[in-house]
């Protein structure tokens, strides 16, 4: 075991528009090559478009989409006696949010033909309604964990 203490996680300051740490983390994930102002513009335009289409507050749409897209259980490889088993483990809330935001962004980037803010808005709306590529990814991860339930006893030590 390492002798040094655990590192305290740095939480970014909340974003100026919605005063939400979660939105700021999402902006940081959208950001490429340090261009934060462009990332903010994309996220805010996507939020405005989603709010306009669903006629609900943008922050509520985003938080519900992240909640819907986050997996409850996932598999982690564990090596036991020369064999590697996929052991189902519960996902902690921080990782659940992080995975959900990452998957939302990946699914939005995988869509084609429209500006990024429109693709992101469409993916947020789909996740809000429990449909789309992000939700399919979550269900695949959870199905994999369910299929490997027999190995869950390896995760308890």
UniProtKB/Swiss-Prot annotation:
<keyword id="KW-0689">Ribosomal protein</keyword>
<dbReference type="GO" id="GO:0019843">
    <property type="term" value="F:rRNA binding"/>
</dbReference>
<dbReference type="InterPro" id="IPR000235">
    <property type="entry name" value="Ribosomal_uS7"/>
</dbReference>
<dbReference type="InterPro" id="IPR023798">
    <property type="entry name" value="Ribosomal_uS7_dom"/>
</dbReference>
<keyword id="KW-0699">rRNA-binding</keyword>
<dbReference type="InterPro" id="IPR036823">
    <property type="entry name" value="Ribosomal_uS7_dom_sf"/>
</dbReference>
<dbReference type="GO" id="GO:0000049">
    <property type="term" value="F:tRNA binding"/>
</dbReference>
<comment type="subunit">
    <text>Part of the 30S ribosomal subunit. Contacts proteins S9 and S11.</text>
</comment>
<comment type="similarity">
    <text>Belongs to the universal ribosomal protein uS7 family.</text>
</comment>
<dbReference type="Pfam" id="PF00177">
    <property type="entry name" value="Ribosomal_S7"/>
</dbReference>
<dbReference type="GO" id="GO:0003735">
    <property type="term" value="F:structural constituent of ribosome"/>
</dbReference>
<protein>
    <recommendedName>
        <fullName>Small ribosomal subunit protein uS7</fullName>
    </recommendedName>
</protein>
<dbReference type="InterPro" id="IPR020606">
    <property type="entry name" value="Ribosomal_uS7_CS"/>
</dbReference>
<dbReference type="InterPro" id="IPR005717">
    <property type="entry name" value="Ribosomal_uS7_bac/org-type"/>
</dbReference>
<dbReference type="GO" id="GO:0006412">
    <property type="term" value="P:translation"/>
</dbReference>
<keyword id="KW-0820">tRNA-binding</keyword>
<keyword id="KW-0687">Ribonucleoprotein</keyword>
<keyword id="KW-0694">RNA-binding</keyword>
<comment type="function">
    <text>One of the primary rRNA binding proteins, it binds directly to 16S rRNA where it nucleates assembly of the head domain of the 30S subunit. Is located at the subunit interface close to the decoding center, probably blocks exit of the E-site tRNA.</text>
</comment>
<dbReference type="GO" id="GO:0015935">
    <property type="term" value="C:small ribosomal subunit"/>
</dbReference>
